[in-house]
């Protein structure tokens, strides 16, 4: 994802002042987990689209539960990061 794309995602997730305060690791997680949540919310009957959704889930969701726990621990004292991270479910895999 480009820097511009990442900033657009952050602006949708957090107010501009908050987005500017997020550590890069958290911003990357937000972008990935939002893609994961997008694919989790999709339903399809077309076999080709089902395969595409499954690929999207594997690519974007696998490992995010552990990553979220790790980031919450690492940034426990960082109010802006925790505010964003606390919005995500702890278990989606």
Show which residues each predicted segment covers:
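Bacterial N-terminal signal peptides that target proteins for export
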Residues: 1-7
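Short S/T/G/P-rich N-terminal loop/turn motif that feeds into the first structured element of a domain
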Residues: 10-11
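Cleaved targeting-peptide boundary
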Residues: 19-27
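Compact alpha-helical subdomains of small soluble proteins
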Residues: 40-93
């Amino acid at each position: 994802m480009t820097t511009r794309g990442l900033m657009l995602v952050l602006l949708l997730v957090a107010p501009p002042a908050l987005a500017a305060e997020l550590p890069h690791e958290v911003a990357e997680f937000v972008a990935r987990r939002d893609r994961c949540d997008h694919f989790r919310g999709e339903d399809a009957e077309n076999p080709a689209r089902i395969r595409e959704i499954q690929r999207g889930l594997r690519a974007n969701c696998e490992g995010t539960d552990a990553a979220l726990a790790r980031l919450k621990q690492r940034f426990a004292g960082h109010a802006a990061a925790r505010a964003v991270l606390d919005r995500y479910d702890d278990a989606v895999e």
